[in-house]
Curated annotation (Swiss-Prot):
This is Transcription factor phm2. Its main location: nucleus. It holds the Pfam family Zn_clus. GO terms for cellular component: nucleus.
Length: 747
């Protein structure tokens, strides 16, 4: 019986293994070099679609026979294929990591690693790990190298971004990342900006002024014009509440018109900065279809440019780097003017914020005035207000660019400003009055609310970006503090349903929305690290639910803001307040849902997780709405353009045609504005990700929909997730075992 069985086994025809990639096998008469990606696919721009058939091990051969599968074959078998389940691929990768580590360690170390490999897929990874005297959950045992951020060195301008930035999360969708890598290699990026583009901020690029103080003052428009601009600044524009004390400034303003040439040049710069912001507000408040003659619009734009130029000249003549009276106030307002209505944040803005911070520290603003008797109560309170604004700018700009904040909380002790009106104190005050109750809505109250959220936000971003691991209990404690901070917000600034806010000003509604979005954004940053592993490690399901629910909430608010800033909306008059800071948070939420939709566990149709109440259909609907919103902004924003490209891909390849009822026609790309098509010539209106068939034909080409002409964007940024995709796992292998496996997707 056994002889018969062995004979039958010995004469069984063996299957011929497929060594070519799937695409080359279909091309016929094309020899595959078996690299990944192979040269044939790479030359056609299809590197990310180059896949190999799985090579299975002999099922009838016991391990003791000594037959082993080469490492390279097992790498190929772990590549995504039609029959590879997500769990199977993870198991293969874990075993491969252990073996590769064993090959590069001493014999004494191998025993421990082999023992570790025997239970690599066990539940031990999710069990509590003793720390000191307590038992706490550790972070995932094999964090991705991109948790520490990523440096894009392919372009002429190397750039860094932290793992919590929205572009890093988009980058974790492997096919998108591989495509953008290929685009960078093939097309590169110009290191020269178009001649018509002036980089921001202008103060970093302009030449030293030859103007005199007399000439600058003489360039002021008639007083009636200046009066209107200053009135608008104090009565409508609350972009920097408290930085300029209205009572003090208006008194100095009257004295200025009596003897203009006697005014300090830095005070004149402050005046021009306020005029510039006010003129920008006037321009932004105009209806979308302005009926004024083009000459009138051009004149207003020229006035804004002149006011900005004069502000810079005053800063230079006043030697702003040395500080002094009005220096920081003028710099802050100039900074806000450069950011006003800015669609995409620029690195020069972050550099300028660092300059402002350094000047403030040089002048001692990071130390509370109560420790210095020579500082009057009035000056001390104004210093607190200015420092509060600098803290907010540092946090906001750093978050938008995915960079660390510059302020170290351990090195500052400046107290919060008090909840006071400007009329409550002035230069002659011998002591400050007590802070008003937070039921009284002063211009400073919103500053206080933001400052308290940011104090938690700084701790959250530090934990999320630190190179050392923190216990999971630290994460949960920060989550608790974040929820407490939300509950402690003044009642007038807590987000409630728009239907119950009909008697509230549009300004207050947007302030509420900003605070709510900030809370949800910090929730994502705090829990994002566990998003990719929580489906397998149940101990992290709290983080998964918090991250997904926060992203959904942000996109719901994006839809609301977009609806209500239309001409007939409740927020139309305050639409200018929706800046790039809002866009960054919306992009972060978009990237989170794209990642989850693209990397959800197999078989998950209705819901991602039992702890997440939102279903796939609702997530797709939110992303479709978000795509429509970003599409309207493509002509002005490169970031919006990238978001649309990613959404088209994800919505076309997330299984929507299986269980959502969407048709191919419904997933056709939205028409792009003419300006966007001229700026991004490779983005064609007939491109459709939904019908794309990976590797099905050599004539299929992936249109270069995201070429980066300016080299400012960084789509090969660190991912910050425990990736469940083969190509991202191989990135980790290259670092654990150098030169053992060729890199394919490194930035």
């Amino acid at each position: 019986m056994s002889d018969t069985a062995s004979t039958a086994t010995g004469h069984r025809k063996r299957d011929k293994p497929q060594l070519s990639c799937n695409a080359c096998r279909k091309r016929k008469r094309v020899r595959c070099d078996r690299l990944h990606p192979c040269s044939n696919c790479a030359s056609r721009g299809l590197g990310s679609t180059c896949t190999f058939a799985a090579i299975s091990s002999p099922t009838n051969m016991p391990p003791s026979h000594g037959h082993s599968i080469p490492v390279q074959h097992r790498v190929e078998s772990a590549r995504p294929g039609p029959t590879n389940s997500m769990q199977t691929r993870i198991n293969q990768l874990e075993n491969l990591v252990i073996e590769l580590m064993n090959q590069n360690n001493t014999p004494g170390m191998r025993t421990g690693l082999q023992n570790q490999g025997s239970d690599a897929r066990s539940d031990a990874r999710c069990q509590p790990t003793p720390l000191s005297s307590e038992t706490e959950f550790e972070y995932p045992v094999a964090p991705s190298p991109s948790d520490h951020g990523s440096i894009n060195t392919r372009l002429a301008r190397p750039t860094y971004v932290s793992s919590s930035h929205w572009a890093a999360i988009f980058d974790s969708i492997t096919e998108l990342r591989n495509h953008f890598v290929q685009e960078d290699i093939e097309h590169g990026a110009s290191t020269v900006l178009p001649s018509s583009t002036v980089p921001k901020p202008q103060i970093l690029y302009g030449a030293w002024t030859s103007e005199t103080p007399h000439a600058i003052i003489s360039s002021l428009p008639p007083r009636t014009t200046v009066d209107r601009l200053i009135s608008r600044y104090f009565n409508v524009l609350d972009i920097a509440p408290g930085v300029v004390h209205s009572t003090q400034f208006l008194r100095e303003y009257e004295n200025f018109w009596m003897a203009p040439q006697d005014a300090p040049i830095m005070w004149v710069g402050l005046l021009f900065a306020m005029m510039c912001l006010s003129a920008q507000l006037q321009q932004a408040s105009l209806p979308a279809h302005d009926s004024r003659p083009s000459s009138s619009r051009a004149s207003q734009q020229d006035s804004i440019a002149i006011y900005r130029e004069k502000t810079i000249q005053c800063l230079q003549l006043g030697h702003y780097t040395m500080g002094g009276t009005h220096a920081l106030e003028t710099l802050i307002l100039y900074f806000l003017g450069e950011c006003f209505n800015l669609k995409d944040m620029e690195i020069g803005i972050w550099i300028l914020s660092g300059t402002i911070l350094q000047i403030a520290i040089h002048m001692g603003y990071h130390r509370d005035a109560k420790n210095f008797p020579s500082i009057t109560p009035f000056a001390g309170e104004m210093r607190r207000r200015v420092w509060a604004m600098i803290v907010q700018l540092d946090f906001s700009i750093s978050a938008q660019l995915g960079l660390p904040t510059l302020i170290k909380a351990s090195q500052t002790d400046t107290a919060e400003p008090r909840n006071l009106y400007d009329t409550d104190f002035d230069e002659d005050s011998s002591a400050l009055p007590e802070s008003r109750p937070e039921t009284e809505v002063t211009p400073t109250l919103y500053v206080l609310a933001k400052l308290r959220l940011i104090s938690i936000g700084l701790r959250v971003t530090n934990v999320a970006s630190e190179s050392r691991t923190r216990s999971y209990s630290d994460v949960l404690e920060l989550d608790r503090q974040l929820r407490e901070a939300r509950d402690a917000l003044p009642s007038s600034l807590k987000w409630i349903d728009l239907g119950t806010s009909l008697n509230v000003s549009s300004q207050t509604i947007l302030q509420r929305i900003w605070l709510e979005v900030t809370i949800q954004q910090l929730t994502i940053v705090l829990h994002k690290k566990f998003l990719g592993v929580s489906g397998l490690q149940k101990d992290f399901k709290t983080s998964r639910a918090a991250c997904l629910n926060a992203a959904v909430k942000i996109l719901e608010l994006q839809r609301l803001v977009d609806d209500e800033t239309q001409p007939d909306g409740l927020l139309y008059q305050s639409r200018w307040r929706v800046s790039s800071a809002f866009s960054n948070d919306f992009l972060l939420a978009t990237s989170i849902l794209c990642y989850c939709l693209q990397n959800r566990p197999e078989g998950t149709i209705s819901n991602f997780d039992e702890s997440v109440s939102v279903g796939l259909d609702q997530i797709r609907a939110l992303l479709e709405t978000s795509k429509s919103i970003w599409s309207r902004q493509c002509a002005e924003s490169k970031e919006a353009h990238k978001a649309v490209a990613a959404l088209r891909y994800v919505l076309g390849h997330s299984g929507a045609d299986v269980d959502s009822g969407y048709t191919v026609a419904e997933r056709q790309p939205l028409p792009m504005p003419t300006a966007a098509l001229s700026y991004f010539p490779d983005l064609t209106s007939d491109y459709n990700f939904a019908g794309f068939d990976f590797g099905s034909s050599d004539t299929t080409r992936w249109t270069a929909f995201a070429s980066d002409e300016l080299g400012e964007e960084n789509w090969s940024r660190g991912a910050g997730f425990q990736q469940m995709d083969m190509s991202l796992k191989l990135e980790a292998f290259d670092r654990v075992v150098p030169n053992s496996i060729p890199s394919r997707c490194l930035s």
